[in-house]
């Protein structure tokens, strides 16, 4: 059975991700107590169901300590994938303010003895980060701070499409002016490269468009940087495999996330596609939703 566990910070988009998986044919359960998961998986398998998605958050805090061992045990019998959603505190505060929802850890002592005294929204967010942090190392992280809901749905679908028999290498382009991604394992700053933005004909285009590709591809300094990043990754990928890493996210950043970072992310994804399962995604580039994330074969 394919089991997708969705966890992370409240307000980061777990409901959006769960809905995307439901649309993809998964049997979905929100806020399932972790200790019930093995029994549910057995029951659904006996019923002929082969895809299950479960959202787990800090409301299950009493059982979160069991999750690492539970994930290992389930992985021996099933294809288990963990998706960890995160977002900046500023983004989360804005989302809770807009929806007027209460954070699950900002309760009063009369309703939640484990939480204690009523805390501010920011304190509740930081407390939840501490509670769910151990789960981040088991899964693929997505920083949803600057993502629209339809883009997140596309990224989730790409996540479940990739094979689970090898390391998944994720290249993510972004713009520094919108903040650095929280999900990056490695981050490369390519702002030192010549910027197509200053060519008025190239300014409205992206690193996916042929004129921008031709501009950057003609520059020796661009190929030097590409070669250095590629050599670094090729050297260290075997060590990450030996460490049983399932996912590795490499973020490539330029000023706006539109030209240079997109071109380098695409080029590196193509070059490394024989070294690992590769996904490339573009956080800030003004591209079509389907082009914002894709498998590289």
Swiss-Prot record:
Recorded hits in SUPFAM superfamilies, A to Z, give: P-loop containing nucleoside triphosphate hydrolases
Q: Where does ATP bind?
A: 8-15
GO molecular function annotation: ATP binding; GTP binding
Where GTP binds, per the record, is at 57-60
The entry's family comment says: Belongs to the RapZ-like family.
| Alphabetical list of HAMAP family matching this protein | RapZ_like
Protein name (database record): Nucleotide-binding protein BTH_I0482
